[in-house]
A protein has these predicted regions:
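Single transmembrane alpha-helix segments in multi-pass membrane proteins
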Residues: 19-83, 107-113, 251-265, 299
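Hydrophobic alpha-helical segments embedded in the membrane of multi-pass proteins
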Residues: 42-51, 67, 71, 100-103, ...
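Structural signal for alpha-helical transmembrane segments and their membrane-water exit/capping regions
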Residues: 14-30, 58, 131-135, 177-184, ...
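Cytosolic-side transmembrane-helix boundaries in multi-pass membrane proteins
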Residues: 1-16, 20, 194, 201-208, ...
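Transmembrane helix-bundle core of multi-pass membrane transporters
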Residues: 3, 112, 116-182, 209-211, ...
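Transmembrane alpha-helical segments in multi-pass inner-membrane proteins
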Residues: 221, 231-298
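Helix-loop-helix "hairpin" substructures at the membrane interface of multi-pass membrane proteins
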Residues: 86-94, 100-105, 109, 157-235
Length: 331
């Protein structure tokens, strides 16, 4: 129980302490406007990170998600701008394509027994290359539906405006929590991440589960690509470069073990929030380079990976400790 909950508790503690520090330096952090801006600015990252959580929980990795964002953007820009397709038709079309691509990668990973790192790396290069073939330049997306979605928001007390993008990200997190803890699929993901051999012995179809895991990951990455295209009002082949690393960082900082089997979607939300908090603090400060965000995230990653290793060793030692037999003399 401690092994499963301690990383999440530490992540929440880091976020609370970080927010309180930001509040002492800049009282404006108490405004709901700032909180809503953090949600909007990191909506696409939060959506991707939920999918990445399931991948890492299973003991895998998905390096293709950044390229999925790029492909989604240029595909939408092309079919909406050049072919006149309505976004209401283009969105489900590209979502189906994204899910199919993830299912194909999941099938290759299980059938060929090739590490997910290699398969998804190939997927990353493939989709990035296809994105460049579509267009090397940024393609603006001019459509009334895009204008409506980008400005859609609800006023909340304190002057904040909760955007549709931020609300969608929170909805994805809630659905992710439900999938992870209240469905057979979620249980299978945890079992496979804990011990794939045991999962097979228990009769769990690792192939079916692996396919669904990567389908979910790329499906959410495609959804994030739609959100990103609405946020930027454009499609660009260079979009999403390095986002896969930001997503992995959010998941790890959120308390999910890289070895798989332990972690929560809620922790990932706080991992994304910590990154957003650091970026916002740097923007408020005005004197620090934006690269300090990467430095701070790097330091946090070192700390959390060390924590993960310590917890894993402690758990293994407790599991392998000898059992002392007590002989009771019978009279």
């Amino acid at each position: 129980m401690i092994k499963r909950n301690l990383p999440l508790m530490i992540t929440i503690g880091v976020f609370v302490l970080g927010y309180l520090y930001c509040l002492t330096q800049f009282p404006g952090f108490a405004s709901t406007r700032v909180i809503c801006n953090i949600l909007t600015d990191n909506a696409f990252l939060g959506i991707i990170a939920v999918g990445m959580t399931f991948v890492i929980l299973s003991g895998g990795i998905d390096l293709s998600v950044g390229s999925v964002i790029a492909f989604t953007g240029v595909f939408l820009a092309k079919v909406i701008g050049d072919f006149g397709l309505s976004p209401l038709l283009a969105f489900p079309l590209v979502l189906v394509m994204g899910c199919a691509f993830g299912a194909f990668m999941g099938l290759l990973i299980d059938a060929l027994k090739i590490p997910a790192f290699i398969i998804t790396l190939a997927g990353m290069f493939f989709l990035r290359g296809v994105s460049y073939l579509v267009s090397e330049e940024s393609i603006p997306i001019n459509h009334p539906i895009y204008d409506t979605l980008s400005s859609l928001a609800w006023k909340i007390p304190g002057g904040g405006r909760l955007s549709a993008m931020g609300l969608l990200m929170l909805a994805v997190v809630v659905i992710g929590i439900f999938l992870a803890h209240r469905t057979r699929f979620g249980n299978q993901v945890y079992v496979i991440g804990g011990n794939a051999t045991s999962a097979n012995l228990m009769g769990i179809s690792t192939r079916s589960t692996t396919i669904r895991i990567y389908m979910l990951s790329t499906g959410l990455a495609t959804l994030a690509g739609i959100v990103f295209s609405i946020y930027t009002q454009a499609g660009y082949a260079l979009a999403g470069v390095g986002v896969e690393l930001d997503a992995i960082a959010s998941v790890v900082i959120g308390g999910t073990l890289l070895s798989g089997g332990v972690g929560t979607v809620l922790g990932t939300l706080f991992g994304v929030a910590i990154q957003g908090l650091i970026q916002t603090y740097i923007n408020f400060d005005g004197t620090l380079s934006s690269w300090w965000t990467k430095i701070a995230i790097g330091i946090l990653l070192f700390i959390f990976i060390a924590l993960q290793r310590g917890l894993t060793v402690l758990w293994e030692n407790r599991q392998s400790s000898p059992v002392t037999r007590v002989n009771i003399a019978q009279r």
